């Protein structure tokens, strides 16, 4: 079975382990097209050729780079004519121009098509995106949703085709694993890891909650963005500047080592009218490293963590503080949550598991399965 995937996300080296895992299914002949760079608001994301065994990774230019709704691959028609895939996996939202154009061009070579969506809030888009969305939902063969809320959104918006709930990427458990040992005398180390430092990630709440902790502790904050100056100012105002380290953007290759130094990882996301946490990938990466995780009850966070971590109400500084205090004072609690977290990742969130479920979708598409159920992890 020939599968062609379009994915700007697969620029990231660690994400490419999913592609290798798909390619390990011997019946799949996989080709993936990525751009050389994506101009994200947080900064340019350049292609990392980190995991490229078993499949073809092609690099094609895109037009309107950085424009989420209007970018597209101008060479796709030629690629489709040359490869003639059985399945075109469009790793993109259904209301974007890239998806609409890819679907239209795939029909020329009779390829089955699927889209991927994280969209966990119902939004109504202006013309022409509402028209693009309507046509994609009517003509696409399959939908993969990154979370249960996205599945519900697209059913509400009229998508009647088959779908599955499968996270976009899992974790390579061989890369993200516990450190050989943690120095018990180094004090309690807390971490926050977001690519962008923006208000909805709740890092200010974490600073305030941590400032109440007694004893010896440190806080590492990964990421960069418009809120960094105000967060640095807040750390000074709280009198904890010497305990807080702003580490900037941590690359995917650096992330395993970054997480392994932590005792606890916090994702303090807060829901906004136009956004709520779609998944929280850093949670499963930390869990794989046997780091205790603490998350706000925003969006998908509670479903990702399950019983393998601690949950607190959004914006509840004292609840977050008490979770951190309990973790700080109990190595047993940290160890138990760490072990439970890694086991949860091994059961549900490895790249191998995600790849297996994705390949099963490809087979359903080719076999013209009529299954229209929603399944969750």
Predicted features along the sequence, with ranges:
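Conserved acidic donor-binding segment of nucleotide-sugar-dependent glycosyltransferases
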Residues: 102, 307-318, 326-332
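Conserved donor-binding/catalytic core segment of Leloir-type glycosyltransferases
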Residues: 4, 182-211, 220
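Nucleotide-sugar-dependent
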Residues: 197, 267-284, 302-303
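A short, histidine- and acid-enriched strand-loop-helix "catalytic/donor-clamping" loop
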Residues: 8-11, 95-97, 105, 109-127, ...
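Short hydrophobic beta-strand element within catalytic cores of glycosyltransferases
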Residues: 285-295
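A short, well-ordered alpha-helix in the C-terminal region of glycosyltransferases
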Residues: 319, 326, 333-348, 357-360, ...
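Nucleotide-activated donor-binding/catalytic signature segment of Leloir-type glycosyltransferases, i.e.
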Residues: 232-253, 264
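Donor nucleotide-sugar binding/catalytic pocket of nucleotide-sugar-dependent glycosyltransferases
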Residues: 34, 138-178, 185, 193, ...
């Amino acid at each position: 079975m020939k599968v062609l995937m379009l994915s700007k996300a697969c620029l990231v080296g660690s994400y490419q382990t999913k592609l290798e895992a798909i390619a390990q299914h011997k019946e799949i002949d996989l080709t993936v097209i990525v751009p050389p760079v994506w101009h994200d608001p947080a900064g340019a994301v350049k292609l990392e050729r980190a995991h490229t065994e078993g499949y073809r990774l092609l690099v094609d230019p895109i037009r309107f780079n950085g424009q989420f709704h209007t970018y597209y691959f101008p060479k796709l028609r030629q690629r489709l004519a040359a490869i003639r895939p059985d399945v075109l996996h469009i790793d993109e939202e259904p209301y974007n121009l890239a998806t609409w154009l890819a679907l239209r061009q795939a029909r020329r070579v009779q390829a089955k098509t699927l889209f991927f969506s994280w969209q966990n809030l119902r939004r109504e888009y202006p013309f022409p995106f509402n028209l693009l969305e309507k046509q994609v939902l009517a003509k696409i063969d399959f939908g993969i949703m990154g979370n249960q809320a996205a599945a519900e959104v697209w059913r509400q918006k009229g998508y009647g085709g088959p779908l599955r709930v499968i996270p976009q990427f899992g974790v390579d458990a061989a890369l993200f694993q516990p450190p050989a040992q943690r120095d018990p005398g180094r004090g309690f180390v807390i971490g926050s890891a977001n690519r962008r430092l923006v208000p909805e990630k709740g890092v200010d709440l974490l600073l305030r909650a941590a400032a109440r902790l007694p004893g010896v502790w440190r806080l590492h904050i990964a990421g960069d963005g418009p809120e960094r100056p105000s967060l640095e100012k807040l750390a000074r105002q709280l009198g904890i500047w010497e305990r807080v380290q702003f580490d900037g953007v941590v690359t995917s290759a650096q992330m395993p080592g970054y997480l392994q130094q932590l005792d606890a990882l916090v994702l303090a996301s807060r829901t906004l009218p136009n956004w709520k946490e779609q998944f929280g990938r850093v949670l499963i990466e930390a869990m794989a490293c046997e780091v205790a995780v603490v998350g706000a009850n925003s969006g998908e966070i509670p479903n990702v963590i399950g019983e393998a971590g601690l949950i607190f109400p959004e914006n509840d500084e004292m609840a977050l503080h008490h979770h951190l205090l309990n973790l700080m004072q109990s190595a047993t609690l940290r160890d138990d949550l760490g072990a439970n977290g890694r086991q949860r990742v091994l059961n549900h969130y490895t790249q191998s598991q995600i790849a297996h479920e994705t390949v099963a979708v490809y087979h359903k598409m080719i076999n013209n399965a009529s299954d229209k159920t929603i399944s969750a992890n």
